Regions:
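Long, low-complexity or tandemly repetitive, helically biased scaffold regions used
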Residues: 6, 10-145
Length: 145
């Protein structure tokens, strides 16, 4: 019978930390998306949505140390840069979106969220790290041998 090698505890801890980071970032992103009206609701005021997004960024930044791992250093650096860029755009959003029509305002909101694309690469890196077995070589072992 074949079994998987044990997972690296440091990789598992980094993954758990990344999940907390992602949850905080998702909540902030949802706050910003709440400004976009739908058929059932008019959309939240832009200033409140931006404030919610910035709060989500702050909460996500607080979780960065939780997924600190040498194998994720590059991904984490790219993520920090992405958070900074998204914050700059979000802070400028009320001024740049003032007076814009619906579609153009939504494009500006999308521009803010597009800055977070490196977070997807960080997630892939964290998942890949988690899949690496604790044993060197990454081979499966035969149970009982």
């Amino acid at each position: 019978m074949w079994r998987r090698s044990r997972a690296d505890p440091a990789a598992e801890a980094a993954w758990a930390g990344f999940l907390r980071f992602a949850k905080a970032l998702d909540e902030g992103s949802r706050a910003l998306l709440a400004t976009v009206p739908s058929a059932r609701r008019p959309g939240a005021p832009l200033a409140a949505s931006v404030a919610g997004f910035l709060a989500g960024l702050d909460a996500a930044r607080a979780e960065l140390p939780a997924w600190d791992h040498p194998a994720l250093a590059d991904a984490q650096a790219a993520t920090v840069a992405a958070l900074d860029a998204a914050e700059r755009r979000a802070r400028d959003l009320p001024a740049t979106a003032d007076g814009l029509e619906f579609e153009h305002r939504n494009e500006r909101v999308a521009d803010v969220l597009d800055e977070l694309e490196p977070v997807q690469a960080a997630e892939r890196a964290a998942r890949a790290l988690r899949r690496q077995p604790l044993r060197a070589g990454g081979r499966q072992t035969r149970q009982g041998r």
